[in-house]
A protein has these predicted regions:
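Carbohydrate-active catalytic/glycan-binding domains of CAZyme proteins
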Residues: 1-187
Length: 187
């Protein structure tokens, strides 16, 4: 499933946005080619405020979406629905609102990933605007939400902005590094 934020217009002239804000749309593909691409439709209705920057996390039989709302900052909702992408039939339960706002102010660009060394531990990066950029949060129980990660065990350069995180095991990382034609480190 591929998802993105978009305005949906009432007419071809793009004079009026349906609902007034951005929605999260989705499509499906098995191999990221045009031959298998299929437009799915509406995933999350943004209403008048709009949704942007969503991230999907699946764990313990549930699907969670962590999404930037233009009115509520970052929120997290969960569902046990097997067809969680189906807007018409999926009921979402709010887990947490205003994620990261009390410390960082305006945040967006949520990115989640699993800790490969500790079971039931996930990380969430939220982009603190305009600087310093990504700030880390942590959860050991997704149904209880996210907490600030206060630790000297991590380092992110200033202006690390939102995008995606690819969660790799050490073995996967080593395999990628070994496949490099030339070392990225110059001596």
């Amino acid at each position: 499933i591929v998802y993105w934020s978009s305005n949906v217009y009432e007419d071809e002239a793009h004079t009026s946005v349906v609902g007034g804000g951005s929605d999260i749309m989705y499509g499906v593909t098995t191999d990221f080619t045009q031959e298998t691409w299929e437009y799915g439709g509406l995933f999350l209705d943004g209403g008048s405020a709009g949704w942007i920057d969503t991230n999907i996390l699946q764990a313990n039989g549930k699907t969670y979406h962590i999404t930037k709302s233009n009115s509520e900052q970052i929120i997290m909702e969960s569902t046990e629905a097997k067809d969680w992408w189906n807007y018409e039939t999926t009921e979402w339960t709010r887990v947490q609102s205003n994620i990261g706002q009390s410390r960082f102010g305006s945040v967006e660009g949520p990115a989640t990933f699993t800790d490969h060394s500790q079971e039931n531990r996930w990380y969430l990066f939220v982009d603190d605007l305009p600087t310093p950029g990504y700030q880390p949060m942590v959860s050991t129980n997704l149904d209880e939400g996210w907490e600030y990660l206060d630790s000297s065990d991590y380092f992110l350069t200033t202006y690390t902005k939102h995008g995606g995180v690819i969660s790799l095991t050490k073995a996967q990382y080593d395999a990628l590094r070994n496949a490099d034609a030339e070392s990225a480190v110059k001596e």
